[in-house]
Amino acid sequence: VVFDISAYVLDDVQGIVDILEGRIGHYVFASSTVVYGASDILPIAEDFPLDSTEYQSQYGRDKIICEKYLMDLHRKTRFPVTIARFSMVFGPDNNLIDREQRMFTRLLKGREVLIPGRGTTLGQVGHVDDEARALRLMAMNPRTFGEIYNITGKDYFSDEGYVDTCAEVLGINP
């Protein structure tokens, strides 16, 4: 099994496929829930429309392109791919250094945490251990080939609620 958490653009994916095609049991591509369009309804299901508009970030557009390539490849050649769309991941050994730490540092220093808009945007976060468990369940499971899964926590937070929860963990009033 190859868990590819490093491919961001089509060239990355095509390079791996060229090397591994015919010699791999399972390729799991790490995508992102950022590929979806805006929604006031949570949870977002895997068949929710993708956002390919000009408002989508380059990162999101590139993930959509990679997903389409891999799903087309699966349909044409049965390439054993599963797409895992992650939301924000938190926990130890996070590969995005300082994601949570920046906010915790601001809270601990009594500095304002900047929240976009009114802080009412809803989202989900997933703990790295839970998301790793989901990947293990997918590994070498033929029922997951050609499928897309949202991998995230079960709880929803507003941006403001997320900051408040972090402040509560620290025992401070933001």
Outline where the language-model segments fall:
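Short-chain dehydrogenase/reductase
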Residues: 42-68, 97-101, 124-125, 156, ...
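Mid/C-terminal beta-alpha module of Rossmann-like enzyme folds, strongest
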Residues: 137-174
